Amino acid sequence: PGAEAKELFRPRVGFNVQSQVTDTLSVAAQYFFNWQSFDNQAYRYPESGTYLSVGDPLLWAGESFIVARSPFAALPGSPDYLRAWRGKDIEPDDNSGNYGLALRWSPLWADATFGAYYRRTYDMQFQLMLTPGLATTVPAATCTAIGGQPLGGTNCIINKQVTDLSLLRSKGKAGEYNAAFGEDIDMFGLSLSKQVLGVSLGAELSYRQNMPLVSEAVQVLPAPLVNRSRGQIATTEVPKSGTPGALGDTMHGIVNLLGIVGTTPLWDTATWGTELTWMTVLDVTQNEAVYKGRDNNKYLPYNLLDRPDDNFFGLAVNFTPTWFQVLPGVDMLAPMTWSAGVAGNSAVTFGGNEDGGTWSAGIAADVRQRVRFDLKYVAFFGDYTKCPRKGSPPTGFCPTGAMDVNNGVTAAISDRDFVALTIKTTF
């Protein structure tokens, strides 16, 4: 909360060019080189096992997750549970491109700057793909027909590429899961920046095509077992790049205001800012069956707490009073921030969730405008449901009282407040 943009962006290999065409018109272009040009360009999260981790199996240090109790648990040396192991990520095609063009126009009559933008990019966040190696509902005849290995009853190794009998018994490997990153996302945007009555106004509106949507894991099965109404795909349909999850066309909007409050009996000066965000899904163009906001009349219903809504609205507010020269060369500040989803759940990952967000409050010292010390308390909040799920008995995978479904990342770490000390300087 309250982080500056320059604290969040990672260096990437690429180039930017800009030209001032006229006194009021400028043109800019940027190009980032391939996905592997700087390790890779996916977002970085608090890693598996760390204090702020929200999904240990899903991050770079993730190795496996439990899927069921093992039928071989009684055998000596066999694990109690079956697991899916982390497989190779499906990354964007290096040739899919990450580039953009921008036009900015600042006519004197408007006393404002208008912008128009185009971006071709790929998603920095992933969707999940799950490839089961073991099935428990496949008759022996069907198992043999698809080239599987019958294990008795309706148990069948349906995919020998991801497991075998030895791995099942000794390691409990029942399949693999993969992170898949969307590509070929086209974004068209407009922007406005202007001073209104001493307040800085900024606004953006963007339309995105092929945008990855919040999805359940896509299952990969032998072709005869595929159920299209569940969003499943055949082993021969696994993409070499991109994602098999839900994609769609979305619209996004932002309006922000920044201002200054003059001297009062409480402070020497203060700055404030507020930002309203909005997004909506216009159309689902790929694999709606795994989209968490899917049409429940057409597909298997999804009605859990994190179901996306038609529209999402989020609000962020910050306020920082300042006291000059409380000590020679030292200015004191008290930065405070709050941000949350105020209506609806976003259809894009990390886009925001209703009643979920963060807040922070602290003190800061700016020493000779060269070194800044910040001490702040940071908290997270959000809604979640607990086990057992309504209508289901408690299980070993979801013991009574454990978190079942979290409505967004901040809900998942709502018990992990912390105090942060930051020291930064410019040189």
Q: Where would I find each of the regions flagged by the language model?
A:
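Solvent-exposed loop segments that connect transmembrane elements
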Residues: 1, 41-86, 126-177, 215-243, ...
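Outer membrane beta-barrel
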Residues: 1-56, 314, 343, 352-357, ...
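Residues that define the transmembrane beta-barrel architecture of outer-membrane proteins
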Residues: 9-13, 95-99, 184-188, 249-253, ...
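Residues on the lipid-exposed face of transmembrane beta-strands in outer-membrane beta-barrel proteins
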Residues: 15-19, 101-105, 116, 190-194, ...
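Short loop/turn motifs that connect adjacent beta-strands in outer-membrane beta-barrel proteins
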Residues: 24-28, 40, 106-113, 262-272, ...
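Transmembrane beta-strands of outer-membrane beta-barrel pores
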Residues: 31-37, 107-109, 118-124, 196-198, ...
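C-terminal structural cap/anchor segments
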Residues: 244-347
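Outer-membrane beta-barrel "beta-signal"
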Residues: 370, 411-427
